[in-house]
Structures are given as structure tokens and as C-alpha cells.
């Protein structure tokens, strides 16, 4: 276990508290599908939850203020033909969400400003390229409209959502199922955890493995890997004796871990959630009833145990609110959305402070919703750090969090065009090039011209026949 050494840390007294029953989301049938994803995604406007659905896959999108009992007839996002396995909100548009499914597709949806009024079955775009179920979807942190997906076909595809095209395909880097993928701070690298017990750091644009570690965790159960803001990689997994482990790795010297800790013998996969502003990692085990949190520092033992928040009920999944959605007036440093079997329960983490003033040390400038790069720039090789915003003035819950729109989102353009036209609202990644469209149009115009000529000649013939008939009658 962890040595409880008394050390100076402003997060030693982080206090966790579940909200009251009337502030939970009740009567929700959380998905029972066997896949180790979080099943929940949250942003400052909505909470999305993967739910049970007959005849396909669905997830529910609720405005944050829509607490209490949720009606069984409440609309869902239900375009997939197989169970939904993973969902992820776009960091640059709080109304755009991506979903991956057992039906081998990735779909991108645009949720109305005030939430769903009727069920949504037509996505903005369908991304087709995987041959097996899609278990991971994750947006690029700094480039607009760049989305990564990973399937049980052991492939990673990076898409330009604005055009519906697959731009990068990593086919030969993983021999088995990919459990998790995480972008680094500026989105230039990804780290992956695979069933072959290896963690890999990959440059996706060069399609090169920068670093890899075999048997990062020797147990057979799934691993997870995330990037920290300093470039190190934090992993969770299982030892050979089936003990749950966490480890810290430096990709520049990945042969030996910077730190390794054994935790317990529970068999639930540990989902890590990371706050780059405070360097705190929260571990939520599927099937656990607790959230453990650790501070990562440059001093040995590098991973410092802070505390554990425990409730009575086990968790089926967990959502983690981005920093810009927190209540800074209450010194809230994290908010989780815990999935039970039939409800979603928000859990608030606060650092008790006597002063009512804004706590600069708890809230350094954080990543905002503006994207420093367009998709095309990133694919051309440019990198950009997150555009930071101050939380000093906080946010009003429920208000639109798109602080500034530098350029109109391509997704919005696609949505408006789709609603104007009579064609279906979704467009597959295998869309016909414009040159072919022009050729087809020319062909159609020629056909119309020949039909007009045919009609004209037939009219003349009919006229002559009518004339002959009238003479015969006389």
C-alpha cells in the first residue's frame, strides 16, 4: 500500500461529496454492454450517457439542469444499428459529440442548443472505415474537426470530420485489440494500451512508434494509458498476481518505470482521469464504489496518494467534467458523474478555503473552447498548444460556453446545408468527388434535351393523326 507521508500539498484535504437525490438523473437504463469504456461524457452544457436500447444502439443527452426522474419516453440519439461502445464531446463545440459502435461505424452528431426535443437518428456525418466494432473515439485537443477512432480490427483511423475523409490509417502498429488511446497536450503524439500488454507512444502523422514498452503490466486484464502535461505516460493495469497497479513512465527512457504502485486485488478496470492544471490523477474502477486520487510531482516517489472518496453503490461508468464547467466560487476542483444501474449521480470535489476570493493557485488558466489549428493545418504538420482562458469570472451553468468562434465550424455549415436540401442529413466518408458529379449532371441534361425533342416530335405526330381522324368523321 501507499506510505502516508505528511507532505505539503494544497490537495491533501480535497473533500468529495455526492449531490442530493433531487440533483441526480434518475430512472436511466445504463448500458449493460461488456466493454470497458466510461459510458458517460460530460461538458459544461450536457451530460451524455450510453443506455440500453432495443434494436440498435443509443445514448441519451441531457442538459445539466435536467435533473430528477427522466421519463421513459425521453428522446435519445439512436442512429447506430449496434450497441454504442464509446462517446466523446468535441472540446471546441459543446453541441458536437462523436460515437463509436458495434456496427463498425463512427457517427458525429450536432445536439440542438437546448437539448433534444425528439429522438435523433440522422447524424451530421457517418465515418465508415473499420471492419469490426469501434471501441474508442477521441477528439484532437487542439485541431478543429480532427477525430480519432480505434476498432477491434486493430486499426486506428484519424478523420477530418469537416470533409468526412479518413486522412491517416495506422494498420500495422497493433497486433491485437486497442484498449485505450490518449492524445498528448498539443496533439502531436498519441499513447496506446494494447491487449498484447504493450504501451506505445506513436507519432500519427509520421506513422512511427516513438517508444514502446512490453509487459508494462503483466496481468491479462485490460490496461489504460494517458499522457500527462509534461510528456510522461501514466498507466493502470494488473500485475501477474492480479493486483491492480498504477505506473508512471518517461517515453525518453521507457525501459524502467519512474514509479509503480500496487493497489488491491479487485478485478475492475481502473479508468484514469487527469487534470493537467493541478497534476492530479483520479482513478475510478468499474465495479468499485470509490474514487482514489493522486498528485504527480517531480519529487520521489513521484506519484503521491492523496485520498479516497467512497460511496455505498458500485459504479458502472464515470463522466468527468472539463475544468471550465466547474463552480470556482465553491472551490470545486473536479466533478464526476457516476453511473449506477438506474441513475447518474454527480460527485463534487472541493478544496475547503476560508476566503471567498478567487483562488488563483487552484485555478491557473485552463484550456478553453477555441481551437488554435484547423484540421488541414494539423494534417500538414503544424502543432498548436491549447488556447488558455481564465476562470476568474466563472461560468453560469446552462449558458452557451462557446466563448469565441474564430471561424464558423464546418459542422454547422454541413448541418445547415443538409436541412435545406431534400437529401439525407448524413454523408458517408465514401462521398462522390465533384468531378463525377459534374459529369453526371451533364449526362442528365443531355437526357432531358433528348426527351424534350421526343415529346415535341410526338406532339406533331399526334396533331397530324387528330387532323386525319377529323377528316374521316366528316
From Swiss-Prot:
Residues 418-435 have a biased composition (Polar residues). Residues 434-468 form a coiled coil. InterPro entries: Coronin, DUF1899, WD40/YVTN_repeat-like_dom_sf, WD40_repeat_CS, WD40_repeat_dom_sf, WD40_rpt. It is found in: Cell membrane; Cell projection, Lamellipodium; Cell projection, Ruffle membrane; Cytoplasm, Cytoskeleton. One of its GO terms (molecular function) is actin filament binding. GO terms for biological process: actin filament organization; endosomal transport; endosome fission; endosome membrane tubulation; membrane fission; neural crest cell migration. Gene3D superfamilies: YVTN repeat-like/Quinoprotein amine dehydrogenase. It holds the Pfam family DUF1899. Residues 415-437 are annotated as: Disordered. It is a peripheral membrane protein. Keywords: Actin-binding, Cell membrane, Cell projection, Coiled coil, Cytoplasm, Cytoskeleton, Endosome, Membrane, Repeat, WD repeat. Belongs to the WD repeat coronin family. Plays a role in directed cell migration by regulating the activation and subcellular location of RAC1. Increases the presence of activated RAC1 at the leading edge of migrating cells. Required for normal organization of the cytoskeleton, including the actin cytoskeleton, microtubules and the vimentin intermediate filaments. Plays a role in endoplasmic reticulum-associated endosome fission: endosome membrane fission of early and late endosomes is essential to separate regions destined for lysosomal degradation from carriers to be recycled to the plasma membrane. PANTHER family: CORONIN, CORONIN-1C. This is Coronin-1C-A. It comes from Danio rerio. The lineage of its organism: Eukaryota, Metazoa, Chordata, Craniata, Vertebrata.
